[in-house]
Every structure is written in structure tokens, then in C-alpha cells.
Amino acid sequence: MAFSARFPLWLLLGVVLLASVSASFAHSGHSGGEAEDESEESRAQNNPYLFRSNKFLTLFKNQHGSLRLLQRFNEDTEKLENLRDYRVLEYCSKPNTLLLPHHSDSDLLVLVLEGQAILVLVNPDGRDTYKLDQGDAIKIQAGTPFYLINPDNNQNLRILKFAITFRRPGTVEDFFLSSTKRLPSYLSAFSKNFLEASYDSPYDEIEQTLLQEEQEGVIVKMPKDQIQEISKHAQSSSRKTLSSQDKPFNLRSRDPIYSNNYGKLYEITPEKNSQLRDLDILLNCLQMNEGALFVPHYNSRATVILVANEGRAEVELVGLEQQQQQGLESMQLRRYAATLSEGDIIVIPSSFPVALKAASDLNMVGIGVNAENNERNFLAGHKENVIRQIPRQVSDLTFPGSGEEVEELLENQKESYFVDGQPRHIDAGGKARRAHLPNLFRTFY
């Protein structure tokens, strides 16, 4: 019983399923007898963990940029109820633009996906100005007024904002100081008497100075000389430390935790960064060469939200589903397969085995919630492979193949973490040769 609690048998079955699929990656669909020729569109509709880029709702858009909000994670499924407090936003802006001052009712983790930004945080005693580059991240506490500038003359800015809601679970609201055609300043909601007393000025002067509609939207063009003046005071992110209490940090400020000729994974955990510790979040950046495979693995505690930033990826995720037949409840393995394009998002629940293949050169960013004390357990590869730690006597009773066959199979792969996604045992017709697979995998074909 102690062994089962530490290493659930269904995870072993999951890696067997993933490994059999990896032998021929063109093999698609779901387990349990579902049609193998199921279309990508059909698989997407049946995958509650997949969010296409068209699942973003446009909150604001003009000629200078846009702000989009991903639908609630639990909007269409109860399987992601644990993510009800989290929302994902995407901010894009053209060169030399300003996102007007505002504050959010949620804690925000801001991550630069593309371009450069000047972020200014306003506080009662002054303001902090930071220059953000690609891969930089920073926590913005709820209620903190801030504004964003794209200082570049040519490159667009793209930022991912991860919101941790608490006032109204799952609801993110921004409060803008300025009046626009879309929404008046929140100051305008106060009565004339309150405003006159607060500013010790007549209402006409207050209205003309603070409240009249000035802009077409919350993203506006900004003169270059004004940008240069603000940029003079900007601090860059620290590449030497991960533990700053309030300053930006970069995802690639340290060596990757996994790296070889096929790919790299950079990761910052709550244990290494106080801002992430406050939010109980991990951040990672996955880079893979075309054709590489990130071998089957699972996270012990963290549920990871993966965003396809550049390139395309084939993802296979193994989970359990409850089935009821003749009044009896049972569990069934299910494989969720998807091809991700730029802007798509997939959620990897904790304990669900997953494998990814780069269909092109690939860059993805991951945000893991409930991340403190998380461990990543690999189910294939030479290093950190938990199956390799199972003694032969137990393997004899766990798998169809003998313990010796299991050990021989696991020794075949000399690489770790990232491997060549093209199986070596391919016949002239492009199909995996089953005869060369040990008994461990034959029963899953």
C-alpha cells in the first residue's frame, strides 16, 4: 500500500500509453476504443484542457493596440474548477504607445513575451520605473496604479498578464483615471460636493482638468521625447538575482534546469523568488528544436498553464475519467491530444502525465499554480526517471514484461528530458515495428 500511495499505478499505465504513442506519433485520437481518425477540430472540442487563441475575448481594441481576456478556465468544464480564481490577459501595443494609468482589483503577474516595455508603478511616496525586456516578469499588487509604455520605434509589445482574483473570484476589473469614449474616469462617479471638497476647487475646474473626455481609448500614441524622458529613470531587471522583493526578474537569469541538443527548460520556483512565493506560482520557459520530444513526465502538485508563444507543438496528456456502468463506478484512462499554434493555451493538471513534441522550433511559457514543493517526475529518459527506481522484483509484478526486460527497455534511451521525437525503429512504410518492442508495450497496440 505504501508503494501505491507514493507512485500510483495509473501513472505507470499512463506512461505506457504515452510511450506506445511515441513509437508512432502520427497515431492520434483517444484511448478506450475511440476513432483513431478523429479530426484535430473534433479533438479540440472534446478537450476541456485546450484553449484556442480564439477563446480570448477582446476587452478593448484600437489602432494602437488591444487588451484581451481568456474565457474562464471553468466556464465549460468542472474539471478546472481549481482554476476559477485565475484569469489570463494578453496586452499588445504598437511602437511608441502608452497604456493609460489604472489599477486592477487583482494581483497581477506580468510577463513580457515580445518586445520591450517601460513599466511605471505609482505609490503614495513616489514611483518606480522599470525597463522590461523579453522574459522579464514582475508582480503588481492589487490596487497599485501603473502604466505601460512601448518605447521601441519599430517592434510591437506583447505582454501576458496572469491575474489572481480575490474580490470576486474569476472577475478582473481595471479602474482607469482618464475619461475615454469607452468609459469615463472613475472619479466622475463621485458627487460634485465630494469632489469640490476633496480638491478645494470649483466643479467646473475639476471637470475641465480631470474628467472631460480626452482620449479615444486607453491605449494612446506617445511622443518620442516624452518616452525618452521617462526612460532615463528606468531600472533594468536584475540578471544576477532571483530573490528581489519588488523588482523585475528574468526567466533566463540562471542556467536552464534541463538542457541538451534538443531543448532547454528554464524555471523559477516559489522557493527561489519571493514574488512567486507570495502567489504560490512557478514560471518556466520551454525552448525546443523542431522534431524534439519532451519525454513523458508529470508534476506532483502544480497545475501548469502552458502558452504557445512561438511555433507549433503536439501535446498528449493522459488523465482519468469516471465511468458508470450498470450502477458501478469505474475509472478509465483517456488521452487528450492537441496541436498547439501560437497563442493557444493548454492546462496540464497536477499528476497528469504529459509529453510534447515540437512540430517546429518552439517557445512556450508556463505558469504553474499551487507550485510550492512541486516535483517533476520523469517517466522516460536516462536521468530522473522514476520508473528506473522501481526494483526488478516489483517490475515483475507491475508490467507485462519481466523486470529484466523493463530494465533493458529503459536503458535504450541514453538522452534525458529532451529526445529525438522520431522513433528509430521505423520500417520502410513509416510505421513503428511492433516486433521490436518488448512485451511491455505490445499489449497497448
Curated annotation (Swiss-Prot):
Domain Cupin type-1: 49-207, 249-407
Alphabetical UniProt keywords: Seed storage protein, Signal, Storage protein
One function term, GO molecular function aspect: nutrient reservoir activity
Signal peptide: 1-26
Gene Ontology CC: protein-containing complex
InterPro entries linked: Cupin_1 (IPR006045), RmlC-like_jellyroll (IPR014710), RmlC_Cupin_sf (IPR011051), Seed_Storage-Functional (IPR050253)
Membrane-crossing segments per the record: none
Subunit text: Homotrimer.
Function as written in the Swiss-Prot or TrEMBL entry: Seed storage protein.
Family: Belongs to the 7S seed storage protein family.
Record-given protein name: Canavalin
Annotated source species: Canavalia ensiformis (Jack bean)
